UniProtKB/Swiss-Prot annotation:
One GO cellular component term: cytosolic large ribosomal subunit
Pfam families to which the protein is assigned, alphabetical: Ribosomal_L18
Organism: Drosophila pseudoobscura pseudoobscura
Subcellular location: Cytoplasm
Family: Belongs to the eukaryotic ribosomal protein eL18 family.
Protein known as: Large ribosomal subunit protein eL18
The entry's keywords: Cytoplasm, Ribonucleoprotein, Ribosomal protein
Gene of this entry: RpL18
Length: 189
Protein backbone atom coordinates (compact mmCIF):
# COMPACT_ATOMS: atom_id res chain seq x y z
CA UNK A 1 0.00 0.00 0.00
CA UNK A 2 1.49 3.33 -1.03
CA UNK A 3 0.92 6.62 0.78
CA UNK A 4 -0.26 9.78 -0.91
CA UNK A 5 2.60 12.14 -1.58
CA UNK A 6 2.14 15.57 0.04
CA UNK A 7 1.98 18.45 -2.41
CA UNK A 8 4.77 20.90 -1.58
CA UNK A 9 3.75 23.32 -4.32
CA UNK A 10 2.72 26.13 -1.95
CA UNK A 11 5.29 25.65 0.83
CA UNK A 12 7.67 28.42 -0.20
CA UNK A 13 6.89 31.86 1.23
CA UNK A 14 7.90 34.45 -1.34
CA UNK A 15 9.04 37.58 0.46
CA UNK A 16 12.33 39.37 0.83
CA UNK A 17 14.36 38.58 3.90
CA UNK A 18 17.30 40.74 2.80
CA UNK A 19 17.89 43.41 0.15
CA UNK A 20 18.83 42.25 -3.37
CA UNK A 21 21.39 45.05 -3.52
CA UNK A 22 24.99 44.39 -2.54
CA UNK A 23 25.43 47.99 -1.33
CA UNK A 24 27.45 47.72 1.90
CA UNK A 25 25.94 50.87 3.41
CA UNK A 26 22.40 49.62 2.85
CA UNK A 27 23.36 46.29 4.37
CA UNK A 28 24.78 48.06 7.44
CA UNK A 29 21.45 49.84 7.87
CA UNK A 30 19.69 46.48 7.58
CA UNK A 31 21.95 45.10 10.33
CA UNK A 32 21.18 48.11 12.52
CA UNK A 33 17.40 47.99 12.04
CA UNK A 34 17.35 44.21 12.42
CA UNK A 35 18.92 44.72 15.84
CA UNK A 36 16.52 47.56 16.74
CA UNK A 37 13.49 45.61 15.59
CA UNK A 38 14.54 42.63 17.70
CA UNK A 39 15.38 44.64 20.81
CA UNK A 40 12.63 47.29 20.80
CA UNK A 41 9.87 45.15 19.25
CA UNK A 42 8.30 48.32 17.80
CA UNK A 43 6.17 48.40 14.65
CA UNK A 44 8.09 51.44 13.33
CA UNK A 45 11.39 49.54 13.17
CA UNK A 46 9.68 46.53 11.58
CA UNK A 47 8.28 48.75 8.80
CA UNK A 48 11.63 50.48 8.21
CA UNK A 49 13.40 47.12 7.97
CA UNK A 50 10.80 45.77 5.53
CA UNK A 51 11.09 48.88 3.34
CA UNK A 52 14.89 48.68 3.28
CA UNK A 53 14.49 45.27 1.57
CA UNK A 54 12.19 46.63 -1.14
CA UNK A 55 12.96 47.04 -4.82
CA UNK A 56 13.33 50.52 -6.26
CA UNK A 57 9.84 50.34 -7.83
CA UNK A 58 8.38 49.89 -4.36
CA UNK A 59 10.43 52.78 -2.94
CA UNK A 60 9.10 55.61 -5.14
CA UNK A 61 10.49 59.14 -4.77
CA UNK A 62 8.67 61.76 -2.74
CA UNK A 63 8.75 65.46 -3.61
CA UNK A 64 9.22 68.31 -1.12
CA UNK A 65 5.75 69.51 -2.14
CA UNK A 66 4.02 66.36 -0.85
CA UNK A 67 6.22 66.22 2.26
CA UNK A 68 5.29 69.83 3.10
CA UNK A 69 1.58 69.05 2.62
CA UNK A 70 1.61 65.95 4.85
CA UNK A 71 3.83 67.67 7.42
CA UNK A 72 1.39 70.58 7.68
CA UNK A 73 -1.64 68.26 7.88
CA UNK A 74 -0.05 66.18 10.68
CA UNK A 75 0.31 69.34 12.78
CA UNK A 76 3.37 68.02 14.65
CA UNK A 77 6.10 70.62 14.06
CA UNK A 78 8.58 68.77 16.29
CA UNK A 79 8.31 65.42 14.49
CA UNK A 80 10.94 63.98 12.14
CA UNK A 81 9.76 63.11 8.63
CA UNK A 82 11.03 59.64 7.65
CA UNK A 83 11.17 58.45 4.03
CA UNK A 84 12.72 55.11 3.03
CA UNK A 85 13.59 56.30 -0.47
CA UNK A 86 14.56 59.43 -2.38
CA UNK A 87 13.38 62.96 -1.63
CA UNK A 88 13.31 65.27 -4.65
CA UNK A 89 12.97 69.03 -5.04
CA UNK A 90 9.79 70.65 -6.35
CA UNK A 91 10.19 74.08 -7.96
CA UNK A 92 6.43 74.71 -7.62
CA UNK A 93 6.78 74.80 -3.83
CA UNK A 94 7.66 78.40 -3.02
CA UNK A 95 8.13 78.17 0.76
CA UNK A 96 9.78 75.13 2.32
CA UNK A 97 8.75 74.65 5.98
CA UNK A 98 11.39 74.17 8.67
CA UNK A 99 11.53 70.42 9.17
CA UNK A 100 13.79 67.56 10.18
CA UNK A 101 14.00 64.95 7.45
CA UNK A 102 15.48 61.47 7.40
CA UNK A 103 15.76 59.72 4.02
CA UNK A 104 17.92 57.20 2.18
CA UNK A 105 18.77 59.80 -0.45
CA UNK A 106 18.06 63.53 -0.81
CA UNK A 107 18.74 65.35 -4.08
CA UNK A 108 21.17 68.25 -3.88
CA UNK A 109 18.62 71.03 -4.50
CA UNK A 110 16.14 69.52 -2.03
CA UNK A 111 18.88 69.33 0.62
CA UNK A 112 19.91 72.95 0.01
CA UNK A 113 16.33 74.19 0.33
CA UNK A 114 15.68 72.27 3.57
CA UNK A 115 18.90 73.57 5.15
CA UNK A 116 18.18 77.12 3.95
CA UNK A 117 14.77 76.96 5.65
CA UNK A 118 16.53 76.16 8.94
CA UNK A 119 15.74 72.46 8.85
CA UNK A 120 18.09 69.49 9.03
CA UNK A 121 18.67 66.31 7.03
CA UNK A 122 19.45 63.11 8.94
CA UNK A 123 20.68 59.70 7.86
CA UNK A 124 19.07 56.51 9.18
CA UNK A 125 21.93 55.78 11.60
CA UNK A 126 21.47 59.27 13.08
CA UNK A 127 17.73 58.60 13.35
CA UNK A 128 18.43 55.34 15.19
CA UNK A 129 20.32 57.32 17.85
CA UNK A 130 17.77 60.12 18.02
CA UNK A 131 14.62 57.99 17.97
CA UNK A 132 15.30 54.25 18.34
CA UNK A 133 11.61 53.43 18.90
CA UNK A 134 10.21 55.72 16.20
CA UNK A 135 8.82 58.15 18.75
CA UNK A 136 7.88 61.58 17.38
CA UNK A 137 8.31 60.57 13.72
CA UNK A 138 6.13 60.90 10.63
CA UNK A 139 6.62 57.97 8.24
CA UNK A 140 5.83 58.78 4.59
CA UNK A 141 6.18 57.10 1.21
CA UNK A 142 5.67 58.14 -2.42
CA UNK A 143 2.92 56.97 -4.76
CA UNK A 144 3.76 53.57 -6.23
CA UNK A 145 1.22 53.93 -9.03
CA UNK A 146 2.63 57.23 -10.30
CA UNK A 147 5.08 55.64 -12.74
CA UNK A 148 4.23 55.57 -16.45
CA UNK A 149 3.96 51.76 -16.64
CA UNK A 150 1.02 51.82 -14.19
CA UNK A 151 -0.96 54.13 -16.49
CA UNK A 152 -1.35 51.20 -18.91
CA UNK A 153 -2.96 48.95 -16.26
CA UNK A 154 -6.72 48.74 -15.72
CA UNK A 155 -9.75 48.49 -18.00
CA UNK A 156 -8.90 48.11 -21.68
CA UNK A 157 -8.39 51.45 -23.44
CA UNK A 158 -11.46 52.30 -25.49
CA UNK A 159 -14.10 50.69 -23.24
CA UNK A 160 -16.50 53.07 -21.45
CA UNK A 161 -15.15 54.86 -18.34
CA UNK A 162 -11.63 53.61 -18.99
CA UNK A 163 -8.81 56.08 -18.44
CA UNK A 164 -6.13 53.56 -19.32
CA UNK A 165 -3.32 54.70 -21.58
CA UNK A 166 -3.08 52.59 -24.77
CA UNK A 167 0.16 51.05 -25.94
CA UNK A 168 0.70 53.02 -29.15
CA UNK A 169 3.43 52.11 -31.62
CA UNK A 170 4.03 55.70 -32.60
CA UNK A 171 2.61 59.14 -31.84
CA UNK A 172 2.21 60.03 -35.56
CA UNK A 173 -0.81 61.33 -37.48
CA UNK A 174 -2.01 57.86 -38.48
CA UNK A 175 -1.81 56.16 -35.09
CA UNK A 176 -5.05 56.13 -33.05
CA UNK A 177 -5.88 59.65 -34.22
CA UNK A 178 -8.06 59.05 -37.28
CA UNK A 179 -10.77 56.34 -37.27
CA UNK A 180 -13.20 56.95 -34.42
CA UNK A 181 -11.72 60.37 -33.69
CA UNK A 182 -13.05 62.29 -36.73
CA UNK A 183 -16.19 61.97 -38.83
CA UNK A 184 -14.23 62.03 -42.10
CA UNK A 185 -12.64 58.67 -41.25
CA UNK A 186 -15.31 56.07 -40.53
CA UNK A 187 -17.05 57.58 -37.49
CA UNK A 188 -16.56 59.99 -34.61
CA UNK A 189 -17.15 58.72 -31.06
Amino acid sequence: MSGIDINHKYDRKVRRTEPKSQDVYLRLLVKLYRFLQRRTNKKFNRIILKRLFMSKINRPPLSLQRIARFFKAANQPESTVVVVGTVTDDARLLVVPKLTLCALHVTQTARERILKAGGEVLTFDQLALKSPTGKNTLLLQGKRTARTACKHFGKAPGVPHSHTRPYVRSKGRKFERARGRRSSCGYKK
